[in-house]
A protein has these predicted regions:
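Short non-domain terminal segments
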Residues: 1, 25, 46, 58, ...
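A short glycine-rich, aromatic-capped structural motif
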Residues: 1-69, 74-94, 176-177
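Short loop segments at secondary-structure junctions
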Residues: 7, 201-203, 234-237
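Residue-level detector of short, conserved catalytic/binding motifs and their immediate flanks
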Residues: 41, 48, 76, 121, ...
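Short, structured beta-strand segments at or near domain termini in extracellular proteins/domains
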Residues: 225-237
Length: 237
């Protein structure tokens, strides 16, 4: 895993403001107005570890005994995994390697609680992901897109093995493109309830959607063939 130094990151997003125009709304009437509001905030980042690559099919299958994807190449990222699958994998990997479990996970209620003082594997936060992706770079990407990423314009409509493109300054591969990556955070709980954040773009994504600051969202039990994940680990004193 790669050591990520402390620092600060500025996050920005455009959120939907939904307001009822009339309390006498009936189905079929134009009762909702949506306005995009820019939200900007800064987050301090403590040092942590982040995986050099997204979790591969080989590693995922070895740890879980399950095969969710339809690919057969061991070095390709695991796909067709939900946020809940990713959280469960983190705990299983922690146990396999002798670390404490970072998550308390209830399969029945699907509730997840973090044990912040443990050294187990976890998903990166939204802020950690962007900070690590940019790696001191200033632009939307840390390099030319064809040099660093598999996206719709060069992927031939398929997933590729990890590590084939150039890494960023901190030695992280495929932070942009190939697969979207699950992050820990809720997107906007008030509006979207339990939707979780995905980052980075994918092999199927247009160029404009593949960047360090691009943020999307999805349900925690959703899975598809261009979403995977990357693991992190806290540095516990």
């Amino acid at each position: 895993m790669v050591y990520i130094p402390e620092g600060e990151v500025c996050l920005r997003d455009f959120r939907d403001e939904q307001k009822w125009i009339s309390s006498n709304y009936k189905f079929g009437m134009p009762g909702v107005r949506k306005n995009l509001k820019e939200v900007i905030w800064n987050v301090e980042i403590k040092p942590f570890y982040l995986a050099k690559y997204t979790v591969t099919e080989e590693l995922y299958t070895t740890i879980t005994g399950k095969k969710f994807s339809t690919t057969t190449e061991a070095r390709k990222p695991i796909i067709n995994v939900s946020w809940l699958d990713a959280v469960n994998f983190c705990n299983l990997l922690s146990v396999a390697l002798g670390y404490d479990q970072f998550y308390d996970f209830d399969n029945g209620s699907k509730s997840v609680i973090c044990n912040y003082n443990t050294n187990g594997f976890r998903l990166p936060t939204d802020a950690e992901w962007q900070y690590a992706c940019k790696a001191n770079s200033k632009g939307y990407r840390y390099g030319g897109i064809d040099e660093i990423a598999w996206y719709k314009g060069n992927s031939n409509e398929r997933l590729h093995e990890v590590g084939e493109k150039k890494p960023n300054e901190w030695g992280l591969y495929d932070m942009i493109g190939n697969t979207w990556e699950w992050c820990w955070d809720l997107y906007d709980e008030e509006v979207f309830s339990n939707y979780r954040i995905i980052r980075g773009g994918s092999w199927a994504e247009e160029e404009r959607g593949c960047g360090a600051t691009c943020r999307r969202k999805s349900m925690p039990d959703f899975y598809i063939d261009d979403i995977g994940f990357r693991i992190a680990r806290s540095i516990v004193q």
